[in-house]
């Protein structure tokens, strides 16, 4: 049984497919839906530039989530934008909010790129305590 469902959303094709699945699951189980977008902070730059980039990222993701709110009408849904490393943000959000199921998209990177960089989906699976469903885009 799913009570609290988290969808990690970045606007990619796989995230859109993951959101569709999360909507279906939330409706089927009467689960509370949490939609989280995690913007990466810049890795370099002056403090003023960094703050401007972070604020721009927040606005971008807030705008990106807006159409999803309409699609989630009728469900108990929460939308949040945070700044940080995506996998870490997803895992911490899940722990803080008692999430029992996470849905994430997975982009089809090549084998070398997956080995070298890892993936957000892989890191979420490795570090969370709840069930994770990965949707390929």
What are these regions (language model features)?
Residues 1, 29-32, 76, 98:
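Short loop/turn motifs at secondary-structure junctions
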Residues 3-48, 55:
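Small/aliphatic-rich secondary-structure junction motif
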Residues 42-43, 89, 111:
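Generic structural signal for helix capping and beta-alpha/helix-loop junctions
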Residues 51-63:
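A short acidic, glycine-rich active-site loop
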Residues 70-102:
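Structural beta-alpha unit
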């Amino acid at each position: 049984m799913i009570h609290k469902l988290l969808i990690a959303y970045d606007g990619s094709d796989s995230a859109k497919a993951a959101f569709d699945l999360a909507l279906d699951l939330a409706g089927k189980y009467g689960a509370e839906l949490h939609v989280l977008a995690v913007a990466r902070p810049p890795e370099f730059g002056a403090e003023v530039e960094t703050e401007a980039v972070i604020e721009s990222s927040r606005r971008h993701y807030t705008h990106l989530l807006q159409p999803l709110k309409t699609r989630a009408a009728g469900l108990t849904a929460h939308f949040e934008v945070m700044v940080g490393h995506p996998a870490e943000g997803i895992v911490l959000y899940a722990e803080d909010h008692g999430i029992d199921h996470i849905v994430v998209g997975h982009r089809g990177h090549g084998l070398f790129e997956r080995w070298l960089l890892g993936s957000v989906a892989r890191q979420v699976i490795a570090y969370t305590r709840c069930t994770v469903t990965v949707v390929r885009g």
